[in-house]
Amino acid sequence: MTERARAKLLDLKARQEAGVHMMCPRCGMDTMKEPIHTNALSRSADVYVCDACGTAEAMLAFMKQDYPLHLWAAFQPVRPPADFKEHSARAVMDTVLRTQSDELRRLYQLCRDDPGNAEWYRLEAFESCPGLIELWPQPFQAKYQAADGAVLIRFRNGPDGGIQMAADVTDK
């Protein structure tokens, strides 16, 4: 779990302890009962979830399965707005390379060095890179949709140990 995810979890716990009415952190539905302690306590995290999610977690626990926290509604990214679908792929590529290449490089390094948290870094990418529609941590590739195609940004380790970046435009 990343620092961003830990901060969200701590904020969620604090809001629940304060008695703030909220959506179920697991499914995102407005099914939480008042007072908060009458809901199910999650087996995955020390927070309350709705009764349906509590039942689902109990069934998964019986089957010795888990529903990862990065799939919970509370941890899904809030995507910043972008109007890339109205511009040409070349213009989108220029904008992304100028404004987001450092952030994408940082995320690549995090995914490379800490592959166990790659899904958390992927969620972080959607919040910090406006217009990003897909991100694959391995091999690292970011995709942006444009009016006339898509822009793909890829990173890899070069033979000299440095990081190499490639940017391509694919037509519709």
Model-derived regions, located:
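Short, intrinsically disordered terminal segments enriched in charged and Pro/Gly residues
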Residues: 1-19, 61-101, 160, 164-170
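Short, cysteine/histidine-rich loop/knuckle motifs that typically chelate Zn2+
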Residues: 25-28, 52
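Short, non-ligating residues that shape and space the ligands of small metal-coordination modules
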Residues: 33-34, 56-60
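Short linker/helix segments within small regulatory modules
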Residues: 36-47
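Conserved short hydrophobic patches within well-ordered secondary structure
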Residues: 47, 55-56
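Surface-exposed polar/charged interaction patches
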Residues: 65-69, 78-81, 94-102, 107-118, ...
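Acidic, low-complexity, intrinsically disordered interaction modules
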Residues: 114-160
